[in-house]
């Protein structure tokens, strides 16, 4: 079993935005290995932090790591999409700060048996929650050519989505595709040789697409962001770290709607819709990792940090 470690991305920037030293209730909606939570708890002199994660192994590892903080921390197994109801069960209806660090964790990538990595031989799984029914095996071996093309194109932004889908369907007709490395090889040889030699691993985009489909990562992200916004007390801050353009676009558009909700014709002399801003965007441009962080944590390469403050 791989040790559950977590190098928190842009920790200093996150803490500066959330300012947990203010006290009150904070939420880490994507607990993972607990790196960000530990940073928050060290500054949280008066208050409590709730950590949410659907991965049971993450809950266990983070709970052990954060045990020294005692009752200041409580882990909740669940999906941050359900944050409002999960916290309502704890009697919490308003919070001072929320962090969402989207995407797959280093532990999930580095644990071969979880099936997230194209570098290691493993069963096709990719479930962040092992209680879920849908796995990568089901997607790869059960989805139609059209469905595969759609998710690989839309969720992976893969230029050769149709070619990759055709190769998957052709190979699975011979025998089921049941391992990560077999799938990675199929993808690799479906992509033109000239393109295989450029950039990251040729399977990266397709694996991302399948993972997003299995875990429903984008299906209700906008709704989840709005629910988290509603939980914030006036003056409360939400910080969100994204890892690809699909996530970032959803977060950016949601934040913009909080700051500029007016639906009137832009040419209208005055606003008549009556919709008022509910939050201020604190990051006019997304914050990205600095050179030093990229050196010691190369997985932070594609990350972007955005934040809002509730009015």
Protein language model features and the residues they cover:
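S-adenosyl-L-methionine-dependent methyltransferase catalytic core, i.e., the SAM/SAH-binding region
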Residues: 1-311
